[in-house]
Amino acid sequence: MRLLLYNIRYATGTGAAFHLPLPGAGYLRSNRKVLTRITEFIRAEQSDIVGLIEVDTGSVRTGMVNQAEHIASQIGHYSTYECKYGRSSLNQFVPIVRKQANAFLSAPHVRGERFHYFDIGIKRLIIELELEDVCVFLVHLSLKFRQRQYQLRSLHDLVVQAKKPVIVAGDFNAFWGTHEIYLFMRASGLRSANTHGLPSFPARVPRIELDFILVSAGIEVTDFRVPDVRYSDHRPLVCDFHVKAAA
């Protein structure tokens, strides 16, 4: 099976123009050409599971286009998504922001999906996708170090409850890379698919390993890549794996 993880930055693009006329102004405007390029890249990868971080589910920014559903329809996948903020968050009432989400696109038969929430941080969503042989969690952790540590503790509690082999994927915002999440991985019985610590951010000249695909025992990683794709500020991760037969 193949898992593709990509923080697409709401298909707002990159480059100097993103910060004009003011720093960060690009977050207010999506680009259909960028969305098309992202979709074409994802289609070409022929992934069984796609985890999307920072996807717009139909705000005025995208002309009411739900990016998760659009990409899913183009590649023939099932989609599930949810706003990444807590259900009681004031962000649920803010235009554009309330449509900022994370999403799974999946080709295999989905046994179940669950939305969990961290107790701390602005970005709180955890999506759990249960397939026949594996559970996959998708996260976007806090920018604040202390909040990330609390979130990792909660994520550990979810992972160890799983009855199947586990994959945890997402933008961890771990500015120290694997060193920052080492104890979480050891406690949860996870290891990084990115054995060489390849950086994924920023996309133009990657220097930091912010994005991770972590796997548990029972999963064999057969290939891992960070493609040179620059449609977002992050580069995507592509992981080929198979679930070992139970002994």
For the regions a protein language model found, what residue spans apply to each?
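Active-site environment of divalent metal-dependent phosphoester hydrolases
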Residues: 11-12, 57-60, 87-90, 144-147, ...
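Alpha-helical scaffold elements lining the catalytic groove of polysaccharide deacetylases
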Residues: 146-157
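N-terminal, active-site-proximal structural segment of metallo-dependent hydrolase catalytic domains
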Residues: 1-74, 81-89, 244-247
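Structured beta-strand-rich core segments of catalytic domains in phosphoester-bond hydrolases
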Residues: 54-133, 225-228
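Active-site flanking residues adjacent to catalytic metal/cofactor-binding acidic residues
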Residues: 6, 53, 139, 169-171
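Beta-strand-turn-beta hairpins that frame and shape the catalytic cleft
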Residues: 1-4, 12, 106-111, 122-138, ...
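Metal-dependent phosphoester-hydrolase catalytic domains
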Residues: 110, 115-117, 130, 157-167, ...
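Short aromatic-enriched loop/helix-cap "lid" or pocket-rim segments at secondary-structure transitions
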Residues: 13-19, 64-65, 91-94, 126, ...
